[in-house]
Amino acid sequence: MERLEIHSEYQRELLLSGLKHFFGDFNDKLLGRVLPRLEWLGAASGEIIFRQGEPGRDLYFVVSGRLRASVDDGLGGERVLGEILRGESVGEMSVVTGAPRMATITAVRSSVLVRFSRRQFQILLNEFPRISLRLMHLLIERLSRSGSIQSNRRRPENIVLLPISAGLDAEVLATQLGERLARFGRVRILTPGLAATLFGAAAMHSTREQTAEYLAMTRQLDELEGQHDFLLFVANREDCGWTRRCLNHADEVLLLASADEPPAPAPFETALATQDDGMSRAGRRLVLFHEAACLSPSATSAWLNARELIGHVHLRRNHAPDLDRLARIVSGNAVGLVMSGGGARGFAHLGVYRALVEAGIPIDYVGGTSMGAVIASLVALDIPPRAAIDSFREVFRVRPLSDFNAFPLVSLISGKRLEKLLGTAYARLIGESRDVEDCWKNFYCIASSYSYAREVVIHRGPLLKMLRASLSIPGFFPPVFHAGEALVDGAIFNNFPTDEMARIGVGRMIGVDLGDDNFGPVVGDEFPGAWALLRHWLLRWLPGRRDGLRVPLLGGMLFRAPMLYSKSRQKRSAEVVDLLIKPDLRAIGMLDWSALEQIVEIGYRHTRDQLQADKEPGFSPAARRLP
């Protein structure tokens, strides 16, 4: 990092705001002691501020820019914990406790920092002991958050639009996107022409060696950033000074591409992504444009394999809802929908989906487990609710679990019939088979690795195969072999995968929990004999006749037993959603495939009534602000 001898009055005001947040009440005497002890520093994009495991000698205040915290994942890579924004501090935990650094901190883009040494900080604490109370409060708050599921929601302030395909007008998209971002804050668009007018052509193309011009423009950009919630930089489709300047200030880069163009990166894109000055540290999101009549994207994997990305978005040209979705995603206001497993009860998700669409609630990300994954994929494919319901009504006239194995060495059911039913349904809706990453809306599902006893979060791969893996109940269906692993039902580890949606970082989350209640207590201390079991089973079919026994039968045991661990974490999973939808399906069995109409209607009516109610259990205040 380089020392900065000159800083603007605006940057000084930003620092004072951060100091007040950190120290609490701030008087002139305390300010007079602090300011002379501070060191102003400039960090380039990609520069490491400190590394995990190093001794904690200093703490830092972010005056402008953005930092990223990450830890070693134990597999040779890194796991991102979050980002430190303007006005926030980093490093205080190690400075106070003397413990090694808990994470590696890297500058996402060009940043201005202020450093406060541990020695100077301790002198200040001795002189103003009341600071300790404020600091203790901040540390306790941070530690309390570390033990719970946290949303990785991030709101980029500087967004760069970089066209990588010829023929795309980035300025038009910036205007369209800016109009939609204005719903969430103040927006300023910086095109090459406007930048030349504001800063001068020489400053636009200045490099770090041209210190005066470079820093002057940096300060001007900092002030613009402070006056707006979003800066949209329109970069050139070439490796030039303006494009590099845009990338140096980027919190996120949108790579704009035409889906009908070759997916291989152009030379200028490769040069910008691999340069040594760290401009590639900002997250890059691929935005693929499709023709308006496109039924479903295809071959997305070729684009993703060629780039290191934080995500991708499919857009249909001149399709306003897709542009609305992009604006919600990049502004941190995306809406996520999570659907739990539940066997035949999963048809209720179709009714929930219909009610959400009728209420005008948009869905930007969707995920699920087992049967929830199947319905979630229909949402992700942008299949209208009525079309999805009609297709499943037709297909599931055939019982999906009736193809028993003559020699059940691996499973009771071969699974071929269910595979054929799903294939028929999806062929009617979208034509040929697709991959997970080809869905219009970003989709994930959960499977369990029988090979390595771990949860598998699936964001890519053949769609139907991945759905089969997510609902392959051990003992009922054979495992699905994929990438060297035997995959089985995701409900074993995570039947209600809200934690993955939180990791994605949506602004609002809707969760649909179809998990049944606990089995409950049994009567007596001995398991009943054969005659008592037979009598119990026969009485179940006679109206009004019960014998008082509570016995788990084979079908229920095979369904429920593998999900006991997942069920133990279901309550915690429900705590992170903004809107919890939990239809009453106790009268429906998990194998009642013939009750599709009834199940769909229960899901629809429950969701419709819940959305219309003023006060409803599970309907949190945050959900009232769903876009």
Residue ranges and their predicted role:
Residues 1-171, 183:
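Cytosolic regulatory regions built on CNB/CRP/Popeye-like sensor folds
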Residues 205, 219, 224-229, 238-367, ...:
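Patatin-like phospholipase
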Residues 212-216:
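Flexible loop/N-cap segments at domain edges
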